[in-house]
Amino acid sequence: VDYNSLFMKKEHEDPLATLQQRYPIRYHNPSRVPVQLLIAGNKLRIRFFVRYGKNMLENFPGTDVTYADIAESGIRKNWGGLYYFPWLADDGFERAHAKANVRILDNNEDPSEEEISPLQPSVRVTVEFVRFGSSTAASGFPKQQFYRVKLTGGSFFPAHVISPPWRWYWGFFRTLQLESLHLNWCRNHPGIITLQKEQDRYTFQQIAAHETGHLLGLGDAYGASYRFFYEAPGTGSFMMCHNRKVQSAELEMVFHSHMTNHMQYFPRKFHYETFISGLRREYQLQFHALAKNDRNRH
């Protein structure tokens, strides 16, 4: 089962529309929204208002680049780019681009419609970061709310996104999802990111991009304990499964999150053998982590 293909097939017969027409996302009070989707036609800018912990501004081992810079680079690389949807209409960009190509290549100042061949329309995504304390933040967004990113050197707890304690537990009754016990997501309170120190730069970037998916309003797709160790079918190549690549289906789930102000979750189910196998594997991993920490202390 290919989750991405099923997602696309479901919407293949929908009427064509630009991104702005299909998802007219607006924020009543933008200064209270730390992560914003800014849409014009088929152009999407994801703007992050971020406040880094002190150690995120330290240099990554073996480089003269900070953890924060490397994380931002990974998020831009993974979430930026072109995304294709079966319902997407051209906002004029592809037609204008095709017309300009004919003008230059064929020396034709006024090509006809038959002479131009626009490419398939795509959502064009760019990523922007506004850091707390920067001149941009001070001058352009003086009352803006920021989300926090922390860095830990411990290995017992993996990287995660969590809500402040006052938002714990009651979110379950909004979603009936175990994931929402400690991440009670909404646009005004997307969560606090905690990243782990990593030796490998690429791994750190991919983890940062995955955790950013939670910040944007996506649940996990991999076989986590709160998913009964059940991996959503057909999501092996997804960012929210194995930190691989952001798929169009994932981005569309983000649109739904910000339209509805509710986190979007991948399908899960309880399967006894899968659950027992996952529980055994989780115990072994925790045991090895504890043993490693004990050796490091001695």
For every predicted segment, state its role.
Residues Y52-G62, L151-W170, K245-L251, F270:
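Short, surface-exposed beta-strand/loop "edge" segments at domain boundaries and coil↔beta transitions
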Residues V65-R227:
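Metzincin-family zinc-dependent endopeptidase catalytic domain
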Residues T194-H298:
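The catalytic-center signature of Zn2+-dependent metalloproteases
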Residues V1-A100, N296-H298:
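N-terminal low-structure segments adjacent to metalloprotease catalytic domains
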Residues S5-F7, P15-T18, L37, I104, ...:
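Acidic/proline-rich low-complexity IDRs
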Residues Y3-F7, L16-L19, Y23, I116-L119, ...:
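Extended hydrophobic/Leu-rich segments
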Residues R47-F49, R148-K150, M240-C241, Q264:
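Residues in well-ordered beta-strands of folded domains
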Residues L38-A40, S139-K143, Y230-G234:
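Extracellular/periplasmic catalytic domains that process cell-envelope and extracellular macromolecules
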